[in-house]
Amino acid sequence: MHATRSPRQPRGWWWHAVVYQVYPRSFADGDGDGTGDLAGLRARLPHLAALGVDALWITPWYRSPMADGGYDVADYRDIDPAFGTLAEAELLIAEARALDLAVVVDIVPNHLSVRHPWFRAALAAPAGSPERDRFHFRPGRGESGELPPNDWRSEFGGPAWTRTTDADGKPGEWYLHLFTPDQPDLDWNHPAVRAEFESVLRFWFDRGVAGIRVDSANLLAKDPALPDLATVASGAPHPYVDREELHDIYRAWRRIAASYPDERVLIGEIWIRDAARLARYLRPDELHAAFNFAFLGSPWEAARMRETIDASLAAGGLAAAPASWVLCNHDVTRTVTRYGRADTSFDFAAVAAGIPTDLALGTRRARAAALLTLALPGSVYLYQGEELGLPEVEDLPPQARRDPVHFRSHGENPGRDGCRVPLPWSGQAPPFGFGPPGTLPWLPQPGNWAPYTVEAQEADPASPLWLYRRAVGLRRSLAAFRDGAFRWVEAGEDVLAFRRGDALLCVVNFSGRPVPLPAGHTVLISSEPSGGDTLAAHAAVWLTPSPPAGPGRPRGNTSTDGNPW
């Protein structure tokens, strides 16, 4: 059976966009309390404009107890006071637009905070009450209901169920949470849940946001029977991952997005490796785009990377939607560190502390990966600090850690704090311009980060910041990145090469030795210094055809020794 190709989606700005992910708590602190905020972000918008990105995606900025970095939302229509006010958010959206930057915000629909009025009302109401119908409350198993209702496990470790206490002080029902106990899952079979989130979408679209990033987009729908995973037959629908009911939800959301004069964008966080299954979310009446997590997790190996790129382009092709590319985000090990290890892949199950890392090698590979990613067709998502080549901070003191993943694993998993350390902007010592002098950032910055600051890198043409600015600028200015057809060029073992139309050739060397480059081309940009005839180890280059040579003048590399071109 062959997958059916969907009609092509209209090509809006998101098809080729470079989107910069802002984790506001760690971006810039305007008031000196140690927490990044909207004042800091507004002051640093010129950095994003200079970088050349098309949009910024802001992770949750809503009212929240911050049990999971803001992904436990208490009020979807207000800004957390730690970040600022709703009025400031509206100013930010307008100021970004004036700089030709679109704003994408995060919506967290699978769950909300235990502090949300809905859940407070549910806890105050008795079992079987309408207030509890918006969640998954169930009696426990066992003689006294002392066992969880089923065998589901939290994504962060431990059971996916927490028991409540009734008004009389006795143990009560259990509620479902696929993440932390502070994040009860909503029941998307309840019409009030659907109506509420459709209203939330309109609330933010009305305020000028250009798009919505949908958190955990493939987890919302649950089998009403909540069966034990151990009883689900092989090949049967999963009780809470990638269920058929999801598509009706996103069709309704797409109708809302399409109702605005300049259609707004829906981008899904969807952890599905099957390209055909992923493509179903990208049909013309559902989501516009989805994150490419297979690419993020792929090791630094030419063959594996090519397989991942082919599968990703196939998924987009099936849905006639843009591919998307991401190397890092606020949940995963930073690229420089991951690429400096023996195992360069990423898997949540394999996250551990104390893995030997060669940061110099990781930096070379990360620079090459930046050019690879920015040359691919589709949209690119760039996590804050990647443009500075920041490594993972692996030596945070135990008392400084905040991530529930770390605590729920009893310290075995280092958690995600290491990729969330506040950005360095200027100066020679912490807080490195993150906040006013004397600011104590909410996570401590390494004392040796002075070379990573924006200030230091702006003065260094060999810095990661210069590389990103030049590459993003070329991507914006060259038509090949918008319209150039993608096709592989066979270039030998450990090398990937592809063309975008006839005007651009990208070559990536995954090996530890120099490799020859094709004749008749001029270097546009290289991740490492290039002599013109060869590409350095663990490096990438963008080439364009050279003008015709005059009589007796060679065109680039004329050597045929070991040259696959």
Q: What positions do the PLM features span?
A:
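Flexible, gly/pro- and Lys/Arg-enriched active-site loops
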Residues: L524
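Active-site and adjacent substrate-binding regions of carbohydrate-active enzymes
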Residues: M1-G520, E528-R553, D561-W565
